[in-house]
Amino acid sequence: MATYQVEVIYQGQSQTFTADSDQSVLDSAQAAGVDLPASCLTGVCTTCAARILSGEVDQPDAMGVGPEPAKQGYTLLCVAYPRSDLKIETHKEDELYALQFGQPG
């Protein structure tokens, strides 16, 4: 099992924690005391949406992210497993929704 450094950024504030490759980024954040938004925990609702600025994740169960947004770096932290050190912008639910479905009504 590999361990990686994860930096999460929200509103200009940065927090860093370690994440094991066999644990989701969200679970690792919670274990480190980093509070991130989440709801369904199954990769569907997009509450935990984030955008990867650098690094790679494996997210085979991210049903809430289409192929094109995934290519642009969007991920769902509840089902994203780190495969390298990561730098991530969090709280991207509205942005991801707009990208996939247009502006929320």
From Swiss-Prot:
Top-level taxon of origin: Bacteria
CDD domains: fer2
Bound cofactor: record note: Binds 1 [2Fe-2S] cluster.
Domain 2Fe-2S ferredoxin-type: 4-94
Molecular functions (GO terms): 2 iron, 2 sulfur cluster binding; electron transfer activity; metal ion binding
Binding site for [2Fe-2S] cluster: 40, 45, 48, 78
Single biological process term from Gene Ontology: electron transport chain
SUPFAM superfamilies: 2Fe-2S ferredoxin-like
Keywords for this protein: 2Fe-2S, Electron transport, Iron, Iron-sulfur, Metal-binding, Transport
Entry keyword annotation includes Iron: yes
Cofactor(s) the protein requires to work: [2Fe-2S] cluster
Free-text function comment from the UniProt entry: Ferredoxins are iron-sulfur proteins that transfer electrons in a wide variety of metabolic reactions.
Assembly behavior: Forms a complex with heterodimeric ferredoxin-thioredoxin reductase (FTR) and thioredoxin.
Family annotation (NCBIfam families): fdx_plant (TIGR02008)
Family: Belongs to the 2Fe2S plant-type ferredoxin family.
Protein name: Ferredoxin-2
Annotated source species: Synechococcus sp. (strain ATCC 27144 / PCC 6301 / SAUG 1402/1)
Gene responsible for this protein: petF2
